[in-house]
Amino acid sequence: MSQLTHINAAGEAHMVDVSGKAETVREARAEAYVEMQAATLAMIIDGSHHKGDVFATARIAGIQAAKRTWELIPLCHPLMLSKVEVNLQAQPEHNRVRIESLCRLTGKTGVEMEALTAASVAALTIYDMCKAVQKDMVIGPLRLLAKSGGKSGDFKVDERHD
């Protein structure tokens, strides 16, 4: 089993020193879901929500969150992201919204936390915008779909077991 990289021999939390690592292109994708009633989803789809364009607001919130991950997650490094993408898809057959985020950079550390933060904050924004019409929406699951670049190698969710 791998060791926890943020914990030293004394069990204390520390930011990982990446100064000796090579710069490589790194990319990560994450997804989150927001389950809701059909009527709530219909308001989002047809644009009749009184707060405005829910998807546009959630997309911008997710992008902003990815850029500020280092301020939210204590041991994350500040990163110069070269790409952040947040896509939202209404899935009326499941009464939910699927959010997929992508983050990319050329750097010394991965962007998994940025992708996860983008997807989660986009989901939270949907909840915030729609809570006046439905308070029992469910956020989740949230997960990393894939990562590439870096010493630990590539990772991709085995979608055959979804």
Curated annotation (Swiss-Prot):
One of its GO terms (biological process) is Mo-molybdopterin cofactor biosynthetic process. Disulfide bonds: none annotated. Its EC number is 4.6.1.17. Pathway: Cofactor biosynthesis; molybdopterin biosynthesis. PANTHER family: MOLYBDOPTERIN COFACTOR SYNTHESIS PROTEIN A. Catalyzes the conversion of (8S)-3',8-cyclo-7,8-dihydroguanosine 5'-triphosphate to cyclic pyranopterin monophosphate (cPMP). Belongs to the MoaC family. This is Cyclic pyranopterin monophosphate synthase. It comes from Klebsiella pneumoniae (strain 342). The gene is moaC.
